[in-house]
């Protein structure tokens, strides 16, 4: 069994008995315990009372965090002509059509977000088995299939976070860097939780929001009080 370092052990001990605390207290605890040699991300995990195997219980959406994510987002855009030029001017990292499709098919995926104009979807659709499992498939429901390429690229670069419920009814996302001020992280947490609440599907039955946990990339997690996790 691998040895646990003193710093890691003391960080874990600080979390004992600290469940269901306020977002502010949780963020302060996590910031204090963060000990990695890089700027860790504050992770939010939400347990929802849904079964995403049923179409009417799927939860997905997008939210722009008030204080950004602190992450450099690489954006690929499928577009031609004037829309391709618009994407480049807006700051897209990769812009193309058939050439971009071939690059992706070769296994080279050097982007975090994929946007497409509607006319490109027959082409992009061929990449479903590659982009789908990576949650990179453009989708009109989250604004990544659009003619307003400029706004989509700027949103992706400016703190927009997509979310989609997983098989076990869990949603997770990074909502900022541990170097952020504590109040900015708390604001981002509440913006994210509020967005997931707004995305509650019609088919959800019983308790929708069951649990919200926060953690750093390398650290232990702590459950927060649900009333503290939402805006009042």
Swiss-Prot record:
One Pfam family recorded for the sequence: Ribosomal_L1
Keyword Repressor: yes
Keyword Transcription regulation appears in the UniProt entry: no
SUPFAM superfamilies xref list: Ribosomal protein L1
Key words, A-Z: Repressor, Ribonucleoprotein, Ribosomal protein, RNA-binding, rRNA-binding, Translation regulation, tRNA-binding
Source organism, top-level taxon: Bacteria
Cited InterPro entries: Ribosom_uL1_bac-type (IPR005878), Ribosomal_uL1 (IPR002143), Ribosomal_uL1-like (IPR023674), Ribosomal_uL1/biogenesis (IPR028364), Ribosomal_uL1_3-a/b-sand (IPR016095), Ribosomal_uL1_CS (IPR023673)
GO MF term set: rRNA binding; structural constituent of ribosome; tRNA binding
GO biological process, one term: translation
GO cellular component terms listed in the entry, alphabetical order: cytosolic large ribosomal subunit
HAMAP family recorded: Ribosomal_uL1_B
Protein family: Belongs to the universal ribosomal protein uL1 family.
Job of this protein: Binds directly to 23S rRNA. The L1 stalk is quite mobile in the ribosome, and is involved in E site tRNA release. Protein L1 is also a translational repressor protein, it controls the translation of the L11 operon by binding to its mRNA.
Oligomer and partners: Part of the 50S ribosomal subunit.
Name the UniProt record assigns to this protein: Large ribosomal subunit protein uL1
Gene that produces this protein: rplA
